Amino acid sequence: QAGGQTCAGNICCSQYGYCGTTADYCSPDNNCQATYHYYNPAQNNWDLRAVSAYCSTWDADKPYSWRYGWTAFCGPAGPRCLRTNAAVTVR
């Protein structure tokens, strides 16, 4: 979502408001708006495959700590995910 617009088909939105499916559009490291706002962690038992989010299966095997860091507050915070710094990313 950018400027009130959303990408069709639950695909990702880049930091500049363009839709796509590559890391340029989906990676939170690029300030992108991946579709994790559809992810309700408590309701879905932290299972990214159980939700209707386009990019979810790419990150479904990440550790729980990584998923918590990006999605724990999506429900209460509204239609966007917040970086909480609750997890450390190892590259």
Curated annotation (Swiss-Prot):
Residues 27-91 form the Barwin domain. The keyword Disulfide bond applies. This is Chitin-binding allergen Bra r 2. Signal peptide: none annotated. One of its GO terms (molecular function) is RNA nuclease activity. Transmembrane segments: none annotated. Keywords: Allergen, Chitin-binding, Disulfide bond. The keyword Acetylation does not apply. One of its GO terms (biological process) is defense response to fungus. It holds the Pfam family Barwin. Disulfide bonds join C7-C19, C12-C26, C32-C55. Residues 1-26 form the Chitin-binding type-1 domain. PANTHER family: HEVEIN-LIKE PREPROPROTEIN (PTHR46351:SF7), WOUND-INDUCED PROTEIN WIN2 (PTHR46351). InterPro entries: Barwin_dom, Chitin-bd_1, Chitin-binding_1_CS, Endochitinase-like_sf, PR4, RlpA-like_sf. SUPFAM superfamilies: Barwin-like endoglucanases, Plant lectins/antimicrobial peptides. It comes from the Eukaryota.
